[in-house]
Structures are given as C-alpha cells and as structure tokens.
Amino acid sequence: MAYQTVNPANNQLIKTYPAHSDADVEAALQQADALYHSAWAKGDIEPRLAVLHKLADLIDSRVEDLAKIASQEMGKLIKQSRGEVKLCAQIARYYADNAKSMLAPVKYPSELGEAWVEHHPSASYWRWSRGTSPITS
C-alpha cells in the first residue's frame, strides 16, 4: 500500500510514497546496525557534533520553506510551523553544543577507590513518528 500526503485544508494530494517491503525494512535495519558498529559511531564525537551543527544551520537557513511544507502537510498556522522548525534547529544546536559534556564520565567519591559513570550507546534508535508531524519528528 502506498502512503500519501494530503493537505488537510483542501484535501488535495501532495505526494504519494511507495510502501516499503519487508526486504526494504530489513536492509534499513542492517544498515543502521552496520553504522552502529562503525568507526563513525565508535570514534571521536567531534565529527558527529559538526554534523549536528550543520543540520541546525541548514534548518535555520530554510525556516520559511520547511514551515510552508509543515503547514501544507499538517494544516497548521504558518506561525506555529515556523516555531516548530526553529525549535528543531535549536534542539540540534543544543545537543551539538552540549553532548560532549553530557556524555563525559562523571566521577563519584568512594571509600573503596575510584568510581565513575560512563555513557555508551547500547543500540540504534528508531523513532516512529505520528503521521501528522513529518518535519518535527
């Protein structure tokens, strides 16, 4: 079954997307797992933070375009869509600016010697978004 984006304001079809087969989903999961085990994921965090900064910059540079798409696809007021698009950029920038310190080991005092908590990824993360929020999810 194909998926469609329909403008809720006028019920006009915006775009049709093909359905994914089981093989498509399996290939995507394998690709995500390969990336999770790659040098990119296990290596220095700086290149990934640079990607988040670039994402924030790209979103900021296209607020109007992205807001128009969101309004068309979800029937939102353009002002609300602009706010959501800007929030997406702010979230990406927040993590780009703070992830390194947030993920740094935290030392705790202990009478038994050194103690600390380290943060390590445990799996790929997939999020299925609501069908009514294609841009912000």
Residues covered by each model-derived region:
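N-terminal Rossmann-like NAD(P)+-binding subdomain of aldehyde/semialdehyde dehydrogenases
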Residues: 1-113
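Conserved small-residue-rich beta-alpha loop and adjacent elements
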Residues: 106-137
